[in-house]
């Protein structure tokens, strides 16, 4: 995975251009022209003078060093623009190295026939404006094949590779599509907090936010640099305060002058401040502050335990119970010590909530949203998806087109288990995880259902056992299952998880108690049921999972710009 992936040269989707191709498109806040616009316009742009800026993907000197050809990319599209530079304009040896940044002015020309160039246009340079040189002996990204593992160690540079830059454009398009979908359907975008005191999942695998450790480190260093006072020091300070107080009293009895009394009172104040400082330092103890053997958070920054959010769902529900249709889209965090290709410590979630809606409305919304994103990618990112199809996962574009048009089959959890058990009994498949009613479906089960049982089609599984789902999911009439649903897709398995929320106060309170969760942190959540409760539902989509599904990239660490996982938090 690196610059060995060759981008498409002349397959830019017309939708990517904001003009008819007869004129170049300038960057709005720069004097350069987008390479995407030049390649999209093709031969119709011949003769126009433009300024382009970008990074050299490959460069070669020809004609015994009299000129050079540069393949330049500016990130606006996966394809490169061929740029020809004469040696009279610049030292060619400083231009041809991979990674060199160039800004040049020139004239667009139609390449001579027979050059074998796939593009219908190239740039003949007239002026070299600026050059950011590269030492090819030390540049970490040579033209040789680069592994994903290597690129994760150079996060600050890996976006220069063809694959990662394509992922960035696809990620951008999916984010745009997300906002577009929900805004078109009259949802309001709500910013939910990153720091929270609630655990939405009840799993306890949360990152804690605290300043106690910083405070403790400062105290311990202070105690080393300035040893704490003794009891004798405190008694001496108290004696000075007593003496200063008696001196003030004597002056008042003797009817001393105002100036003398004021000066004596000032000395008393200094003595009291000194005593307070000594007593405070005497109370300083190394280690975290404790109360009854437990860490005391009352003096922490928020006055209580606080965490990085695992989901914005609970908070965004408060707005759904006032504004009806809302969504949040932001980072979430899980402190799972997992080293798999499916898990990150920091990832992004899309979480809509819909008032006056039930589980069936929830499934309808989830299906429409996934279809919308798939169609958006094919319409807006055809060139990047072509790159993925050719170099990463052959058939990924076919998969997107299929999902965009398919009807998502809906099956109950019980039916899904029966299908899996039947497949095992018939010897069609052997799973690592045992199949029985009551289990949480593993990834291998989810993928078998979508890829085999339902012939590479997306499905929605609903009505899960209550024992494997969160407290806020609505209890069904059978009191064994909850109105929960998961959207399963080929390649990744679960893409979306959602449910109708429990709107009945007595039922949700009982569920919190059953799961052994403390009631106090959720009192505000219970208020939503105490005061004007409403039927509502929602779901969460793992944004990185969606990118994996679209691109076919196996490791989730390669679809987020700056992956965080156990042992890694670079930059």
UniProtKB/Swiss-Prot annotation:
EC number: 6.1.1.22
Location(s) in or outside the cell: Cytoplasm, Cytosol
Residue ranges of domain WHEP-TRS in the record: 233-289
SUPFAM superfamilies documented for this protein: Class II aaRS and biotin synthetases, Nucleic acid-binding proteins
GO cellular component terms, semicolon-separated: cytosol
Catalyzed reactions: tRNA(Asn) + L-asparagine + ATP = L-asparaginyl-tRNA(Asn) + AMP + diphosphate + H(+)
Domain of life according to the entry: Eukaryota
Modified residues (N-acetylglycine): 2
CDD domains per UniProt: AsxRS_core, EcAsnRS_like_N
Family: Belongs to the class-II aminoacyl-tRNA synthetase family.
Protein name, entry field: Asparagine--tRNA ligase, cytoplasmic 3
Gene of this entry: SYNC3
